Design a protein with these regions (language model features):
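Accessory carbohydrate-binding/adhesion or oligomerization-edge regions at the termini
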Residues: 1-43, 122, 471, 475-478, ...
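Accessory beta-strand-rich segments of carbohydrate-active enzymes
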Residues: 3-16, 38, 49, 53-160, ...
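Active-site-adjacent substrate/metal-binding segments within catalytic domains
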Residues: 39-64, 68-76, 81-88, 94-95, ...
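Short strand-edge motifs at loop-to-beta-strand transitions and within beta-strands
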Residues: 58-60, 101-105, 206-212, 759-761
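Extended acidic/polar, glycine-enriched regions
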Residues: 112-116, 181-260
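Short acidic/polar inter-strand loop motif in beta-rich domains
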Residues: 124-131, 237-242, 679-684, 779-784
């Protein structure tokens, strides 16, 4: 058994020429590329979706040694978007029509042993293909290229094609295998290795699954995602005194866990899980789908650790690296077959069924996956087609329930779970529809597969009221899905902004529907999710204050509502170092069902009137309440407040003077506000809001240690303009000039504008090791630089 990574040495042409498949093609101009690769890097916005829709070609030359005689040579592509035809030495050897799943090509019969060989790929990324997800309008781009890793394996004529293990939380298991070639007389050996390194061995025949039970297992769960490793060996018994021979072995990680999806929700190992998730688009600025494993894994880390999600919905099968990270982190995954709204003809449907097979067979050993999506998202009912998708998936994996995302009520329910796209909330009233009014069968599971972002997009550079409105809408729907009995949970749309077609988005080819921008910089609405995390240490405390306290950002200079998104026990407010008030979450208010309701900061005066104006202790709170009402309601007073004003013998002019002294700051220096998040009786996080005095460019590298191999590696970089207190400056739109030093190259432009005070870039390795730096320069701020270390993997 030999394994080779095949991600270097490729040549690319953006225009496919049949000559590329020949042994020699000197007439072609080919570009050296490393995988993963996109057929066309796009600008951040105002891109043209026609640019990546093309028939392109890839080529790789290699030497096939004579020692491969009698062996099987397999070439595996992680994904090629979207229709791939593979040639070996001019001969067509394989065709694959899904840009989101892997495929393996048997090169054996086409090889010239002891000679140079050529593999070529005809890559069709045009959107008129009669395969999913194409055929209708799409609110996302589909890109093109060999967008995941490629490897070559040299095996015996008989080998393991697939392994799959079914488990229960108690330790019971059943192992299934699939083989290729002549295996008469062969046996199987299965080895299960625990995280501590202990091993258990089992033997079996090829015709039957291997069954058994492991004692004292640690179940896989969200809080404790314990992973075991299964290794299956295909063994040919020795004859004539010769030892047994291992023909092939295949490994996968798995977890012991039990899933149940019923009318009451999802139960993992017997415990109900309230799903709190986001939808993830697997695309990135400039590169589309073509990003290495470390960047894929980073998305899972952001979802679980930064955003506090326990689940994610994927509308297409993702990179295996993303699923690996979900397994390790305890992030539940709802993965769906490719497609959006459109269902095509019989040829299209046949490919969709094949996509379902590949999705399940390639992903089913991942314990993080809890639900298969077997309907084209948002499509109309199609009984015969969706009966087949359900049957196909249940046959290949009877351990998980099926679901289908739809946007209509009372749709035909052939699946185990009714997944509903609920965009019913418009800022008032109940945040989601009643489950009983939507699903045709209340005995089955129910979840909300999408909400909010498409209904109320928000750019990071929108004004403060708009950004706050989006955040409160997310909070309202999250709250009401929790409050409604029988709703298993919800998935907000969506994690990040993304490039889209001209028919969608804001006219610049971007859908600003994410709680993060395309570079994974958080918007205010991200704090709604992040603040729902259960804190276990002071570093887990989140505090995001919705207002910059700049009254000029609001119509008429009236600031309106101010909210704090926090998982602290309480919030203290100080004005110019004077204590104003302490606030706690309202457990009976609009967001009472949330684990950590956002806190409305409704008092900006407190006892300051008593301290500085000499107003007595009884009257001061009443006057403060009137002033806070004026702040909230643009100087309008309710009849009750007017009556109070007269009873306190205050004139309107006196009230206005107090308002501008303590709230409106007209004619006096702007106040300094300090917000303290209190946890276990002490302040553990502080936010200070005051006029900007200095600007700093903050540069954060999410993965500063890179390893080149088996593909190029990549560092994600976040850029933020912040003030002297670390607050984001959302209206800073300066350009940042980037330059790389060392074995790195910048993906995308070297000059990037800040949008909403934020930007980003990606740094790719070049195949060499060594120290590296990124230099960032912005007018009005000190230059900044960050250091990275690049290593090369030893072969």
């Amino acid at each position: 058994m030999e394994h080779y990574d095949w991600n270097d040495g490729w040549l690319f042409t953006p225009v496919f020429d049949p000559a590329i498949v020949r042994p020699e093609c000197p007439e072609l101009t080919l570009e050296p590329v490393r995988l993963p690769h996109t057929v066309k890097a796009l600008p951040y916005n105002y891109c043209n979706e026609n640019d990546y829709q093309k028939l392109s070609g890839y080529r790789r030359e290699f030497f096939a040694p004579k020692e491969w005689e009698g062996r099987t040579v397999l070439l595996t592509f992680g994904a090629v978007a979207h229709d791939a035809t593979v040639f070996c030495n001019g001969r067509r050897v394989f065709h694959h029509s899904c840009g989101y799943t892997a495929f393996t090509v048997d090169l054996t019969s086409a090889l010239h042993l002891g000679q140079k060989n050529v593999v070529a790929v005809r890559c069709d990324s045009r959107e008129d293909l009669n395969i999913p997800p194409f055929g209708g309008q799409m609110d996302f781009l589909t890109y093109g290229g060999i967008c995941r890793a490629v490897c070559l394996d040299v095996k015996e004529p008989a080998y393991l094609r697939d392994i799959f293990i079914e488990t229960k939380a108690e330790g019971d298991f059943r192992i299934y295998t699939a083989t290729v070639g002549e295996t008469v007389g062969c046996t199987l050996q299965a080895e299960i290795r625990s995280p501590s390194g202990s091993r258990a061995f089992y033997t079996g025949e090829l015709s039957l699954p291997i069954t058994g039970a492991l004692n004292s297992v640690h179940p896989w769960s969200i809080e404790h995602p314990t992973l075991y490793t299964l290794t299956v060996r295909l063994i040919r018994p020795g004859t004539g005194g010769l030892p047994d021979r291992v023909l092939d072995e295949k490994s996968c990680r798995f977890g012991f866990r039990t899933l149940q999806f019923v009318a009451g929700g999802l139960y993992l190992n017997g415990q109900r899980v309230e799903l709190r998730g986001l939808n993830r688009c697997q695309s990135y600025a400039y590169q589309g789908y073509a990003m290495p494993d470390s960047i894929q894994r980073l998305d899972a880390q952001l979802l679980k650790k930064q955003l506090g999600c326990n689940a994610v919905r994927l509308t297409t099968p993702p990179s295996p690296a993303f699923l690996d990270a979900c397994d390790e982190l305890g992030l539940l995954v709802f993965v769906e077959m490719p497609g959006w709204q459109h269902v095509g003809d019989d040829i299209w449907k046949a490919q969709a069924l094949q996509n379902c097979r590949e999705m399940v067979c390639q992903c089913r050993s991942h314990p993080s996956i809890f639900l298969w999506g077997v309907r084209v998202s948002g499509s109309a009912d199609d009984e015969s087609f969706y009966k087949r998708t359900n049957e196909t998936v249940r046959r290949l994996d009877p351990t998980r329930p099926t679901a289908g995302t739809r946007s209509t009520r009372r749709s035909q329910l052939l699946e185990d779970v009714y997944a509903y796209t609920d965009y019913s909330y418009h800022g008032r009233g109940v945040g989601c529809e009643a489950r009983t009014a939507v699903t045709p069968d209340t005995r089955k599971g129910y979840l909300i597969s999408e909400f909010e972002g498409a209904q109320f997009p928000a750019k990071s550079f929108d004004d403060e009221p708009h950004r706050l409105a989006q955040a409160l809408r997310y909070a309202a729907v999250l709250n009401d899905t929790i409050a409604q009995q029988g709703v298993a949970g919800s998935f907000g749309w969506c994690m990040t902004d993304y490039n889209t077609h001209r028919e969608f988005g804001s006219g610049d080819r971007i859908s600003y529907q994410g709680v993060m921008d395309m570079f994974r910089n958080p918007k205010l609405s991200a704090a709604v999710y992040a603040s729902q995390k259960t804190p276990r240490s002071p570093s887990d405390i989140v505090l995001e204050v919705s207002s910059s306290m700049a009254l000029g950002d609001h119509p008429g200079g009236f600031a309106g509502a101010c909210w704090a998104f926090t998982n602290a026990e309480s919030l203290r407010l100080y004005r110019d170092n004077d204590f104003v008030a302490e606030f706690t979450p309202d457990r009976r208010g609009r967001f009472a069902a949330l684990p950590h309701p956002p806190i409305e900061i409704h008092d900006f005066v407190g006892l300051l009137l008593e301290k500085y104006e000499g107003i007595d202790r009884t009257a001061a709170p009443q006057v403060a309440a009137i002033l806070n009402e004026m702040r909230r309601d643009a100087m309008e007073l309710s009849p009750l407040s007017r009556a109070r004003m007269y009873s306190l013998r205050l004139s309107w002019n006196e009230l206005v003077q107090l308002y501008y002294k303590y709230i409106g700051v007209l004619g006096s220096p702007a106040a300094v506000y300090r917000f303290e998040a209190v946890w276990h009786g002490r302040a553990v996080r502080t936010v200070v809001k005051e006029p900007v005095q200095s600007i700093r460019l903050e540069c954060t590298v999410h993965n500063p240690i890179l390893t080149d191999g088996p593909t190029w590696d990549c560092a994600a970089v976040s850029l933020r303009a912040i003030d002297q207190n670390g607050n984001l400056l959302p209206y800073c739109g300066e350009a940042v000039q980037l330059s790389a030093e060392g074995p790195l190259r910048i993906l995308g432009p070297s000059i990037v504008p800040l949008r909403g005070g934020m930007a980003g870039t990606y740094l790719a390795t070049t195949g060499e090791a060594g120290p590296a730096k990124l230099h960032c320069r912005m007018e009005g701020a000190l230059d900044t630089e960050v250091s990275l270390t690049i290593r090369c993997r030893e072969e």
